[in-house]
């Protein structure tokens, strides 16, 4: 026979766990208010959450509903209705509450407020029996298990083991100490107290671990910790303490002011700073055994005479422990003593040089550092040759300045000015990253895109200059020169480029013969492309000699001419009337062209009205809206499971296949073998109406028709 109150009791337990945040696996944020809940409960009550968790299984730790027009008050009441089937307080607007429930697609939406009140009355009867059994302690919303036999026994066992949580005045405390004497307890109660004190008070850590399945648990709030140090730090700031702790703290402060606790200060002075913090806290916490030893000095020989005196001394020690507070003392900071245990290492410039990329390069500070300048030696044949010769020695300060100027990563004022570029059409100063977007948004009729590199340029002189430079080789020798006039001279005189390359090779030889001795360093560390200095201007491929470049360029130009001939054959489809001004791509409809512009601007202009998420494509937004509505595009014909994406649906259909079966990825029809699938695939091919050629894609069939049959007719 099923118990009618079991379901309501389980829901009550889940609601308690939700309030504690225990085992909650999702967090719902509405503005700046966060609600913790369980995915299983949300998916069982709401179709919206069920579909959302199905499609976002790996990224649903936190869900933001701030853009869904649901207030935090309504969602709090919805959570109460999900967990309990009722609401504790009436909403300010029931219509708004009902709209929020319909928006979240709850399975059971009440028609009026009286339905929830009736459900409240009926469920209170069921939950009353369950709540009557919840007199035991609950940790994180979970009721602790207790043995019914032990619970029906003497309550004195629990009274002796657990400290009282009431506030005791000094008069009541004296009366309690007098009531703990030997004559006030019956004989059976002594045995119970003795057993409980031996089993629980002797080892409080074991008592805590048996009560909750962890090592150290706070007796006030029930939070568990993995080590005792964390428990000690938590006890000092626990906000769920009993009321009697404030009273005992007050008496403790009074005793300290009166000078009664001078022995505690002496104990702190005897402590060595080398001992660990856990040992200090064990010393000052005052275990029951230590409290018993302190109380034994006051009781005298009565402690060792009888068992009854032991019980009385233990109870007195418990009363004394209530007066005691935990004092956390930190050892004095003595940096000079602590630094004795550390080895101080001095970092020199040599260590810094060894930590760089060129580990094999060793600097010798005793040798001078020379500047090199270019000198032209004119021979008999009047052929100019540029060599590197030392001009003058450089001091250490100048040498450091030169080395700081060498790395290309160091930013200069010129580079900082280059980051902010100005628009050539309107003069607006913006960053280079936003310059392309500015041209597309404001001056789209005056700009165009380069056909080789795709860079956005202004029509006119800028386009002509870029067309001349685009595709030309750019070596490190060009980048190394700081003057633009020298760059133009080198472009006009290509013979000097080879001479400068020879100059860099000779510079490497001079470095090898001089004081630095960099024999182990390859040439490519200082000049990356010195082994292959010649480069093809069309494809960018590098060669060692000039003859190889000439031979390669003849074949490379022929290939380009062949490609251009193919491009002339494939003319534009005249049915595409909407073309992009930047890249020249054509479209059948204007909306497709407007959507294509987002490829250049990278602007997500399609925004979801429900959650505010932005998308680059309109079809992505349509698919996202279907997820909000719970409308699946693909439905399994076997198990009726819905999927929003095609590849997810294909992957699900594959799970239904048996050995040897295959599936058509177009219509999702299952076939027993591959032969029948190949015969079936002819149905999905696009056939040319003139020659009968078949293609997998429609665009392939259209391009075939335009290339082969459009000109003939």
From Swiss-Prot:
A zinc finger (C2H2-type) spans 216-242, 448-470, 578-600, 606-628, 634-656, 662-684, 686-709. GO terms for cellular component: nuclear body; nuclear membrane; nucleoplasm; nucleus. CDD domains: BTB_POZ_ZBTB1. Homodimer. Homooligomer. Isoform 1 and isoform 2 can homodimerize. Heterodimer of isoform 1 and isoform 2. Interacts (via BTB domain) with TRIM28 (unphosphorylated or phosphorylated form). It comes from Homo sapiens. Sumoylated with SUMO2 at Lys-328 and to a lesser extent at Lys-265. Sumoylation inhibits its transcriptional repression activity and regulates its subcellular localization. Residues 160-179, 270-320, 384-416 are annotated as: Disordered. The keyword Methyltransferase does not apply. The modification Phosphothreonine is found at residue 356. Its main location: nucleus. The keyword Transcription regulation applies. Residues 275-308 have a biased composition (Polar residues). One of its GO terms (biological process) is cellular response to UV. The modification Phosphoserine is found at residue 355. A zinc finger (UBZ-type) spans 533-558. Both the BTB domain and C2H2-type motifs are necessary for transcriptional repression activity. The BTB domain is also necessary for oligomerization and efficient sumoylation. The hydrophobic cluster preceding Lys-328 enhanced sumoylation efficiency. The UBZ-type zinc finger domain is required for targeting ZBTB1 to UV damage sites and for PCNA monoubiquitination. UBZ-type zinc finger domain mediates binding to 'Lys-63'-linked polyubiquitin chains (in vitro). The gene is ZBTB1. Gene3D superfamilies: Classic Zinc Finger (3.30.160.60), Potassium Channel Kv1.1, Chain A (3.30.710.10). There is a cross-link at residues 3, 200, 205, 260, 265, 275, 283, 303, 316, 328, 340, 346, 381, 528, 563 (Glycyl lysine isopeptide (Lys-Gly) (interchain with G-Cter in SUMO2)). InterPro entries: BTB/POZ_dom, SKP1/BTB/POZ_sf, Znf_C2H2_sf, Znf_C2H2_type. One of its GO terms (molecular function) is protein homodimerization activity. This is Zinc finger and BTB domain-containing protein 1. It is found in: Nucleus; Nucleus, Nucleoplasm. It comes from the Eukaryota. Residues 24-91 form the BTB domain. Keywords: Differentiation, DNA damage, DNA repair, DNA-binding, Immunity, Innate immunity, Isopeptide bond, Metal-binding, Nucleus, Phosphoprotein, Repeat, Repressor, Transcription, Transcription regulation, Ubl conjugation, Zinc, Zinc-finger. Acts as a transcriptional repressor. Represses cAMP-responsive element (CRE)-mediated transcriptional activation. In addition, has a role in translesion DNA synthesis. Requires for UV-inducible RAD18 loading, PCNA monoubiquitination, POLH recruitment to replication factories and efficient translesion DNA synthesis. Plays a key role in the transcriptional regulation of T lymphocyte development.
């Amino acid at each position: 026979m099923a118990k009618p109150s079991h379901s309501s009791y389980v829901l009550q337990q889940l609601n308690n766990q939700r309030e504690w945040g225990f085992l909650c696996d999702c967090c719902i944020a509405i503005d700046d208010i966060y609600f913790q809940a369980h995915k299983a409960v949300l998916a069982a009550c709401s179709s919206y959450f069920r579909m959302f968790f199905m499609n976002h299984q790996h990224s649903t730790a936190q869900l933001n509903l701030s853009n869904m027009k649901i207030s935090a008050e309504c969602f709090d009441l919805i959570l109460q209705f999900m967990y309990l089937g009722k609401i504790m307080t009436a909403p300010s607007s029931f219509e708004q509450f009902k709209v929020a429930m319909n928006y979240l697609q709850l399975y059971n939406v009440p028609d009026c407020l009286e339905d929830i009140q009736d459900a409240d009355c009926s469920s209170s009867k069921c939950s009353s029996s369950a709540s009557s059994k919840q007199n035991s302690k609950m940790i994180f919303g979970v009721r602790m298990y207790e043995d019914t036999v032990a619970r029906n026994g003497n309550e004195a066992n629990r009274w002796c083991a657990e400290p009282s949580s009431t506030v005791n005045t000094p008069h009541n405390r004296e009366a309690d100490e007098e009531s703990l004497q030997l004559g006030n307890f019956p004989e059976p109660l002594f045995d119970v107290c003795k057993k409980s004190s031996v089993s629980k008070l002797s080892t409080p850590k074991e008592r805590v671990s048996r009560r909750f399945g962890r090592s150290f648990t706070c007796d006030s709030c029930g939070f568990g910790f993995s080590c005792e140090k964390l428990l000690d730090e938590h006890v000092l700031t626990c906000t769920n303490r009993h009321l009697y702790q404030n009273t005992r703290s007050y008496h403790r402060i009074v005793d300290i002011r009166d000078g009664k606790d001078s022995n505690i200060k002496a104990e702190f002075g005897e402590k060595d700073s080398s001992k660990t913090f856990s040992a200090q806290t064990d010393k000052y916490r005052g275990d029951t055994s230590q409290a018993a030893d302190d109380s034994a000095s006051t009781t005298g020989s009565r402690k060792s005479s009888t068992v009854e005196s032991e019980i009385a001394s233990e109870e007195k020690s418990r009363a004394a422990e209530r007066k005691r507070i935990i004092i956390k003392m930190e050892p004095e900071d003595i940096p000079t003593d602590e630094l004795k245990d550390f080895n101080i290492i001095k970092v020199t410039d040599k260590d810094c040089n060894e930590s760089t990329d060129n580990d094999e390069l060793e600097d010798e500070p005793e040798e001078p550092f020379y500047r090199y300048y270019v000198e032209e030696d004119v021979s008999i044949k009047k052929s100019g040759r540029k060599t590197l010769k030392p001009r003058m020695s450089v001091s250490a300060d100048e040498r450091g300045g030169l080395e700081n100027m060498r790395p290309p990563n160091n930013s200069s004022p010129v580079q900082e000015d280059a980051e902010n570029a100005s628009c050539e059409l309107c003069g607006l100063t913006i960053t280079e990253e936003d310059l392309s977007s500015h041209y597309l948004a404001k001056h789209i009729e005056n700009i165009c895109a380069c056909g080789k590199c795709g860079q956005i340029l202004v029509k006119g002189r800028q386009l002509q200059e870029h067309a001349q430079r685009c595709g030309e080789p750019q070596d490190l020798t060009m980048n190394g020169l700081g003057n633009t006039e020298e760059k133009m001279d080198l472009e006009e005189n290509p013979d000097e480029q080879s001479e400068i390359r020879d100059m860099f090779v000779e510079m490497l030889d001079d470095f090898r013969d001089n004081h630095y001795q960099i024999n182990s360093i390859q040439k490519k560390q200082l000049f990356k492309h010195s082994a292959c200095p010649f480069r093809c201007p069309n494809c960018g491929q590098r060669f060692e000699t000039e003859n190889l470049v000439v031979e390669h360029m003849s074949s490379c130009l022929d290939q380009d001419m062949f490609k251009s001939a193919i491009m002339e054959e494939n003319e534009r489809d005249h049915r595409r009337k909407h073309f992009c001004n930047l890249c020249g791509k054509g479209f059948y409809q204007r909306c497709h062209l407007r959507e294509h512009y987002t490829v250049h601007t990278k602007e997500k202009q399609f925004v979801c009205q429900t959650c505010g998420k932005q998308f680059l494509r309109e079809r992505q937004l349509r698919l996202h809206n279907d997820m909000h509505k719970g409308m699946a595009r693909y439905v399994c014909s076997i198990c009726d499971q819905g999927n929003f994406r095609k590849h997810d649906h294909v992957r699900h259909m594959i799970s239904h296949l048996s050995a040897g079966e295959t599936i058509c990825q177009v219509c999702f029809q299952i076939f027993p073998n591959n032969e029948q699938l190949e015969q079936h695939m002819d149905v999905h091919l696009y056939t040319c109406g003139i020659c009968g050629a078949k293609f997998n894609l429609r665009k392939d069939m259209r391009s075939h028709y335009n290339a082969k049959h459009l000109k003939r007719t």
